């Protein structure tokens, strides 16, 4: 089902773990603050993208945590609905990580599967800290129709 294995909880009151497909601009929009506010709050380098698995501190001055979570969930559900409108998971395989392999490399170059989908199939793996030898379940997708 859409949204299954999607953990968007707020940690420690004002922090989240960045999910695949999210940008600083998304968080700023959902919170109704400027991206620069989040850059300062998190002591980030300007114009450097945030990473999947990274903890990000949030500013709830203009939006409640519940409203933020609703917006974030709607964004992710939209991505999944669009994807599953055109593709289905036909099978899975196990991939043992080799030195130098990253989620991005597996997602974009090796298997052509969205990073968020790999994350859904590996809920107990910290995809932000992958090391050689870790075994990932990779969903194999096919176009519908």
Task: Tell where the protein language model's regions lie, with residue ranges.
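Extracytoplasmic low-complexity/disordered linkers and repeat tracts associated with LysM-containing
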Residues: 1-145
């Amino acid at each position: 089902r859409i949204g299954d294995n999607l953990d968007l909880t707020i940690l420690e009151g004002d922090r989240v773990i960045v999910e695949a497909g999210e940008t600083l601009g998304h968080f700023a929009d959902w919170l109704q603050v400027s991206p620069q506010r989040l850059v300062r709050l998190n002591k980030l380098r300007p114009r450097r993208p945030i990473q999947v698995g990274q903890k990000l501190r949030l500013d709830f001055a203009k939006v409640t945590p519940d409203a933020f979570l609703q917006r974030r969930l709607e964004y992710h559900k939209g991505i999944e609905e669009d994807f599953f409108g055109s593709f289905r998971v036909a099978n899975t395989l196990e991939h043992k990580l080799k030195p130098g392999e990253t989620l991005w490399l597996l997602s974009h170059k090796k298997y052509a599967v969205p990073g968020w989908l790999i994350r859904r199939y590996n809920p107990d793996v910290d995809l932000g800290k992958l090391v050689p030898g870790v075994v990932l379940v990779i969903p194999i997708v096919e176009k519908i129709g």
